[in-house]
């Protein structure tokens, strides 16, 4: 089994820009594919998950072409063509769930959605059930709970739906379906989740009302394509921020990064742990705040994390665990039920890798209790999960670590290890 060995890293020094935001890239490609005319997606993420989105949209008749670091998209004007083959979503759960909403109202169109072994294990019933309540015709394994899933586009009616658990993917799938439904579609969230879909609806002039935690949309007519600049992905930036915090003498600045407040819960938690962090919003594109973040090495202390922050940092919990391993005292992270059904069972993956690095950890059904103080050199497993691979490269960086199957990082950050080594070498 291949492994990447990271020698102990001295201070990390330098500035960097991380790849484009994965969530915005997925959604931007989809909405441009629905639009009329031609639009460009500037500085998108070009990695495993988003390239799957580009290929699926091509199979549905949209023209998606790479132009240097950008995508050029010629849309279909609200009507996709029926694909000739199964639509392969790869490892991308966001793609599969949003695509269900996008296709549900394409009357008469038939499509089958599948993915890799990990994606075929992930729960889809949370999207399928409310779509069926709108009139969607969706079937699949375990009565639609698992892919492969078959969709036959049908007339949809608006729905008022309260999310049982916070999920930006379910919210987004229903909003996309609502663009083709008769009447109003309203989604109410128990707590706020990332709002990239709502911001992009505004960017493209699509129908949208937001009232507290309720979001509404309704049937749209044809809309023109618009260019879109994708900010750097905060979830990717988080690895370098934590690497700087836990490695003595380090100072790192991440520039051009998205600072959407529905994504930056990690900054709140790290500040509570005593992190030396500064950030500033400089500009916004398509309604997305963009700016810089500076991190300097800090002596962190354990904290009890507010469970209400978890939806605002759901993808950053693995790298928070890396920070907690170096913090003095105990860190308690509750509200992790959603992490059980990510690309891996992330609660288990975090616990097993912390133990492999000599860290004491307790694992509950939806919580972790981490007793920090430092890690020892070891070998970690990604469990086929890009964020686990990168988080535990960071956790072991100050003392040296071997990361099995490092290629999993390419799902969201193809140049991750090169960027990490460059910052180490800069000192």
From Swiss-Prot:
TM annotation in the entry: none
Active site: 315
Keywords linked to the UniProt accession: Amino-acid biosynthesis, Aromatic amino acid biosynthesis, Cytoplasm, Transferase
Residues given in the record as 3-phosphoshikimate binding sites: 22-23, 27, 167, 169, 315, 342
Top-level taxon: Bacteria
Pathway(s) the chain acts in: Metabolic intermediate biosynthesis; chorismate biosynthesis; chorismate from D-erythrose 4-phosphate and phosphoenolpyruvate: step 6/7
Pfam families, per database record: EPSP_synthase
Ranges in a coiled coil: none
A single GO BP: amino acid biosynthetic process
InterPro entries recorded: Enolpyruvate_Tfrase_dom, Enolpyruvate_Tfrase_sf, EPSP_synthase, EPSP_synthase_CS, RNA3'P_cycl/enolpyr_Trfase_a/b
Gene3D superfamilies given in the database record: Enolpyruvate transferase domain
Enzyme class: transferase
PANTHER family in UniProt: AROM/DEHYDROQUINATE SYNTHASE (PTHR21090), PENTAFUNCTIONAL AROM POLYPEPTIDE (PTHR21090:SF5)
Family: Belongs to the EPSP synthase family.
Function per UniProt: Catalyzes the transfer of the enolpyruvyl moiety of phosphoenolpyruvate (PEP) to the 5-hydroxyl of shikimate-3-phosphate (S3P) to produce enolpyruvyl shikimate-3-phosphate and inorganic phosphate.
Quaternary structure note: Monomer.
Name of the protein this chain belongs to: 3-phosphoshikimate 1-carboxyvinyltransferase
Organism in which the protein naturally occurs: Thermus thermophilus (strain ATCC 27634 / DSM 579 / HB8)
């Amino acid at each position: 089994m291949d492994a990447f060995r990271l020698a102990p890293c001295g201070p990390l020094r330098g500035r960097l820009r991380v790849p484009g935001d994965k969530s915005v890239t997925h959604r931007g490609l989809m909405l441009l594919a629905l639009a009329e005319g031609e639009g460009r997606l500037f500085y998108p993420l070009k990695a495993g998950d988003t390239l799957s989105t580009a290929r699926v949209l091509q199979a549905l008749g949209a023209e998606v072409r790479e132009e240097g670091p950008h995508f050029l998209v010629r849309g279909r004007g609200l009507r996709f063509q029926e694909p000739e083959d199964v639509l392969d979503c790869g490892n991308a759960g966001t793609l599969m769930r949003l695509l269900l909403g996008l296709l549900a109202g394409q009357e008469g169109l038939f499509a089958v959605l599948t993915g890799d072994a990990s994606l075929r294990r992930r729960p889809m019933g949370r999207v399928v059930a409310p779509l069926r309540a709108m009139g969607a015709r969706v079937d699949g394994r375990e009565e639609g709970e698992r892919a492969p899933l078959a969709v036959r586009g049908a007339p949809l009616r608006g729905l008022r739906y309260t999310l049982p658990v916070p999920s930006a993917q379910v919210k987004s799938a229903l909003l996309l379906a609502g663009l083709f439904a008769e009447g109003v579609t309203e989604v109410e969230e128990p707590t706020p989740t990332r709002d990239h879909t709502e911001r992009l609806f505004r960017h493209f002039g699509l129908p949208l009302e937001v009232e507290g935690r309720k979001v509404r949309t309704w049937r749209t007519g044809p809309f023109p394509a618009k260019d879109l600049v994708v900010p750097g992905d905060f979830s990717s930036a988080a690895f370098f921020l934590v690497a700087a915090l836990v490695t003595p003498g380090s100072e790192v600045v991440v520039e051009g990064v998205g600072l959407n407040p529905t994504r930056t819960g990690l900054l709140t938690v790290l500040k509570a742990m005593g992190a030396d962090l500064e950030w500033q919003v400089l500009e916004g594109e398509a309604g997305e705040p963009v700016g810089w973040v500076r991190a300097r090495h800090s002596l962190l202390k354990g904290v009890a994390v507010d469970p209400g922050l978890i939806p605002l940092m759901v993808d950053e919990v693995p790298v928070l665990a890396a920070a907690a391993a170096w913090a003095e005292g105990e860190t308690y992270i509750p509200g992790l039920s959603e992490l059980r059904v990510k690309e891996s069972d992330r609660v288990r993956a975090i616990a097993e890798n912390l133990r492999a690095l000599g860290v004491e950890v307790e694992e509950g059904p939806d919580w972790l209790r981490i007793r920090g103080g430092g890690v020892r050199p070891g070998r970690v497993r990604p469990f086929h999960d890009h964020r686990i691979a990168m988080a535990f490269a960071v956790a072991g960086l100050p003392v040296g670590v071997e990361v099995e199957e490092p290629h999993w990082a390419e799902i969201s950050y193809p140049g991750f290890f090169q960027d990490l080594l460059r910052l180490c070498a800069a000192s």
